């Protein structure tokens, strides 16, 4: 069936940036051009959007699908002002949760409550001793558990990052590097169907946000479930295997032996943690903590061996690196791997790249390293007044997220959210990038949109099908109630997604 759609269309194709009409046949685009040209084409149906604007479907290059799905059913702690309110919100959630089932507290930032800390196991025990209880920091790094959860998970008190009191008893708080496998331990208590329902919740939210392609950063179990049940979902899924263990050769073998995953999976690991929790690895010490520099989760050699193995099998590789010291390590390792086994268009990635030095930006550009960055980290974590990071890294907060410098260096950047760390709101993210506190690092609306469409597609080797509206591409597009190029910057956040189409199928319509 052929459809012709008439609207103001921004194609994100620099050779043909706008169109007045777009032809859809089944799941792909067969025409873009003028109204006059379109009227000469015989179609089965015509749709007109005289007051709306059409863009390619957004692409989110960094989503933690399963924690997101589970957290969406948990207690939202983002607005809590003190520990008493945190515990009360958890009690309300426990009251509606069957005994023995997990109670999850999500979107928590200890720096935002009066006490500036996580609740300990005994405070969480006051909520319930008949439910395992788990609180996760908004950035997915520090955690806190009650006694029931600790008993189920079996943390070794000797493990670095498992917090104990003066008597050697677990406090319930888990920090890097011990938290690295905590989520995996928790997932084991959820059935496949539980996890798939979490995937569906994220998928539905993505459609409502205009996101038609998700790069899912999850465990092999989750990647396989998502691939085996892809007919249940609207968004296309680009698998990214996330592992903190750079010696997980069994996991790598499992990816290589799965035909579907072998062809499209990006291998992802971690160089450091996050500023919240003081675990991002920095060159200069943390503010007010002259002996603390964060941590590198792997040695150069460990990271090198893992990246080398991925390159040997022609797999894309990605490393989380937030602090300037961690970023330097990753660039150093990538340079070694790519020198030994060159590939012109490797698209090795660094995730976040929040506090790079000028030299790191220059070197990343020289090596052809691509970046997965999340604009809303500026608002949610750094703070529009920089206070969110200034408490950890002082004046260096003003050097975070240097988008202008990165794009001017010619580096490929794909936008994302790190959901659930930040919400799926691409147009709000554009506003934040255009108004960020470091004025010299602001970028244009077109650059913001490219990060979430054509450049995001290229980040995942999907540019032959995704990210632009032109003949031969997938019919992934969204209908907006206002033209983002015709409203004030501050109004970008208020633009609504009216409809979302994925591969030609209407998957969301605003009520």
Where would I find each of the regions flagged by the language model?
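Short aromatic-centered micro-motifs
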Residues: 23, 269, 500
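Extended hydrophobic/aromatic segments used for targeting, binding, or gating
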Residues: 227-261, 265-268, 356-362
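Non-cysteine beta-strand/loop elements that form the S-adenosyl-L-methionine
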Residues: 64, 264-279, 369-379
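Divalent metal-binding segments
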Residues: 2-5, 10, 14-25, 29-233, ...
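Conserved, mostly hydrophobic/aromatic
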Residues: 146, 210, 273, 320, ...
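Glycine-enriched alpha-helix->loop->beta-strand junction motifs that scaffold or abut catalytic
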Residues: 260-262, 363-372, 409-412
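His/Asp/Glu-enriched, well-ordered alpha-helical/loop segment
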Residues: 308-317, 325-348, 353, 373-485, ...
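Short peripheral tails and domain-boundary helices/loops at the edges of structured domains
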Residues: 497-511
């Amino acid at each position: 069936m052929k459809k012709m759609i008439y609207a103001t269309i921004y194609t994100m194709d620099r050779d043909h940036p706008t169109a007045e009409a777009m032809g859809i046949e089944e799941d792909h685009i067969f025409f873009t051009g003028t109204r006059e040209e379109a009227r000469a084409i015989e179609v089965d149906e015509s749709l007109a959007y005289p007051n709306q604007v059409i863009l390619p479907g957004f692409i989110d290059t960094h989503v933690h699908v399963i924690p997101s799905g589970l957290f969406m059913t948990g207690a939202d702690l983002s607005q809590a002002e003190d520990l008493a309110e945190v515990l009360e919100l958890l009690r309300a959630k426990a009251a509606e949760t069957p005994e023995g089932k997990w109670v999850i507290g999500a979107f928590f930032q200890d720096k935002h409550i009066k006490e500036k800390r996580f609740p300990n196991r005994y405070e969480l025990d006051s909520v319930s001793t008949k439910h395992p209880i788990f609180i996760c920091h908004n950035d997915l790094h520090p955690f806190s558990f009650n006694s029931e959860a600790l008993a189920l998970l079996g943390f070794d008190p000797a493990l670095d990052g498992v917090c104990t009191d003066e008597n050697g008893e677990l406090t319930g708080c888990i920090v890097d590097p011990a938290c690295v496998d905590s989520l995996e331990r928790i997932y084991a208590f959820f059935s496949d169907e539980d996890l798939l329902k979490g995937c569906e919740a994220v998928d539905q939210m993505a459609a409502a946000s205009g996101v038609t392609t998700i790069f899912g950063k999850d465990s092999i179990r989750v990647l396989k479930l998502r691939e085996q049940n892809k007919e249940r979902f609207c968004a296309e899924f680009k698998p990214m295997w996330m592992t903190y263990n750079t010696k997980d050769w069994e996991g790598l073998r499992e990816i290589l032996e799965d035909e579907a995953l072998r062809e499209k999976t990006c291998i992802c690991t971690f160089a450091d943690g996050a500023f919240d929790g003081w675990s991002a690895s920095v060159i200069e010490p943390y503010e007010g903590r002259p002996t603390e520099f964060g941590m590198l989760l792997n040695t150069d050699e460990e990271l090198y061996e893992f990246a080398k193995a991925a390159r040997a099998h022609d797999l894309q590789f990605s490393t989380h690196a937030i602090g300037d010291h961690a970023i330097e390590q990753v660039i150093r390792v990538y340079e070694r791997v790519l020198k030994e086994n060159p590939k012109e268009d490797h698209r090795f990635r660094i995730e976040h790249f929040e506090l790079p030095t000028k030299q790191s930006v220059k070197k990343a550009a020289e090596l052809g390293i691509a970046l997965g960055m999340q604009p809303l980290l500026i608002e949610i974590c750094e703070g529009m007044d920089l206070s969110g990071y200034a408490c950890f890294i002082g004046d260096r907060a003003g050097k975070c997220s240097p988008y202008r410098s990165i794009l001017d260096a010619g580096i490929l950047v794909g936008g994302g959210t790190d959901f659930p760390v930040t919400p799926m709101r691409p147009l709000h993210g554009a506003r934040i990038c255009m108004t960020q506190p470091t004025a010299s690092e602001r970028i244009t609306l077109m650059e913001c949109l490219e990060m979430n469409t054509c450049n995001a597609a290229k980040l995942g080797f999907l540019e032959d099908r995704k990210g632009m509206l032109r003949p031969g591409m997938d019919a992934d597009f969204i209908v907006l109630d206002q033209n983002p190029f015709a409203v004030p910057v501050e109004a970008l956040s208020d633009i609504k997604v009216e409809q979302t189409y994925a591969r030609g199928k209407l998957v969301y319509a605003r009520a």
